[in-house]
Every structure is written in structure tokens, then in C-alpha cells.
A protein has these predicted regions:
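Long helical/loop segments within the catalytic core of UDP-sugar-dependent glycosyltransferases
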Residues: 1, 23-116, 130, 163-170
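Short aromatic/hydrophobic "clamp" motif used to bind/position activated sugar donors
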Residues: 7
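Acidic donor-binding/catalytic loop of UDP-sugar-dependent glycosyltransferases
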Residues: 12-27
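A short, conserved beta-strand element in the Rossmann-like catalytic core
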Residues: 15-16, 43-45, 121
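Alpha-helical scaffold elements adjacent to nucleotide-binding pockets in ATP/GTP-utilizing enzyme cores
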Residues: 23-24, 122-125, 161
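Catalytic donor-sugar/metal-binding loop of nucleotide-sugar-dependent glycosyltransferases
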Residues: 114, 125-147
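Acidic donor-binding loop at a coil-to-helix junction in glycosyltransferase catalytic cores
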Residues: 116-122
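Catalytic cores of eukaryotic secretory-pathway lumenal/extracellular enzymes that build
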Residues: 146-159
Length: 173
């Protein structure tokens, strides 16, 4: 249970950059309208040097599958989401990492425990809540890498991940 106005949601296997909190709270502090969520770039930790939960050295992923996902993440976060952010049209703040306005999350019904795409489901409900009530809001994507995650090492694991993501999207629509 969160006690403050904003909370971070992240996956258990993620490593957060040391100055993550500073990076993601700045758009909230600089905004004149409610920032309901902030997303940041996620990268693959495969191949990086991590010591006691701290990223010591960034290296490209080892292996074709993690390299594929790293490239896909960079395209998604640095090109697509940064572009959508400029127009306040981000459809989803990643479940892997995001800062959320606690009050809006609660008002929108919170996470659906039955959803397989809880990140997109909740983001869409938050946006719907704000639009239906004619409330000004922003969802911001920052270019900074704040979160590192272990990418699927094999095609089989990647397939399971993508199947779950696909089921979640179908469940929402």
C-alpha cells in the first residue's frame, strides 16, 4: 500500500538506476497539470555487469534474442513513446517500470488482478477517467534509462512472453 502521492511499479527482476527517483519525479514537479504517469526507457541487463544490485558496466546483450529485444525496446521507448509523449498520447506505461499518481490509480479502480496486461488496462482506465471528467492530465515518457531487466534468453521464453502479452491485449479489447 502506497502512502505518498506517487508510487513506482516495477517487476521483481528489474534493477533501477541509482537516480531513478529524481529522474521520474522531475516531470511531475515541472508540470502545471496533473501528471498521472511517467514512463522511462527500459534496457536489457543481459551482458551488463551488476554488483549488489547496482549497474556497474553497461554492455550489449549477449545472444541474438536479448539483442533483438534490446533493439526493440530502444525503438519503442526512444522513438515511439517519446513521439507519443510530445502529443500526450501514450497508450501504455510499461508494467516493467512506471511512476503512477496514486490518487488517479485508485479512482480508476487500480490494478485488475485478472488482467494479463494490467499495465495497459490500468493506463487506459486512467486516461478514460480523466477524459470523461474533462480533467487536464499528462502522461510523460522520459528518455533516460531508469530500469534494467533480464531479457528472454531463448526463442521459447520469448514466445511465452509475447503470447502472454498478446493474450493481455485481446483481454482488454
Amino acid at each position: 500500500v502506497a502512502n505518498y502521492d506517487y508510487f513506482i511499479n516495477t517487476d521483481v527482476d528489474c534493477i533501477l538506476d541509482q537516480d531513478t527517483l529524481t529522474k521520474v519525479i522531475l516531470p511531475v514537479l515541472d508540470s502545471k497539470v496533473d501528471v498521472i504517469a511517467v514512463g522511462a526507457t527500459m534496457r536489457m541487463s543481459n551482458g551488463c555487469e551488476v554488483e549488489h544490485g547496482i549497474m556497474k558496466r553497461v554492455r550489449p546483450p549477449k545472444g541474438m534474442i536479448p539483442t533483438f529485444q534490446e533493439t526493440e525496446y530502444l525503438r519503442s521507448y526512444l522513438l515511439a513513446k517519446m513521439g507519443w509523449s510530445a502529443f500526450n498520447l501514450i497508450p501504455n506505461v510499461s508494467g516493467g517500470f512506471g511512476l503512477f499518481n496514486r490518487h488517479i490509480v485508485i479512482e480508476a479502480g487500480g490494478y485488475d488482478p485478472l488482467s494479463h496486461a494490467e499495465d495497459m488496462d490500468m493506463t487506459l482506465r486512467m486516461v478514460a477517467l480523466m477524459r470523461e471528467n474533462n480533467r487536464k492530465y499528462k502522461i510523460v515518457q522520459i528518455p533516460d534509462t531508469c530500469c534494467w531487466t533480464e531479457g528472454p534468453p531463448t526463442l521459447k521464453v520469448l514466445n511465452r512472453q509475447r503470447t502472454r502479452w498478446g493474450r493481455g491485449l485481446l483481454q482488454i479489447f
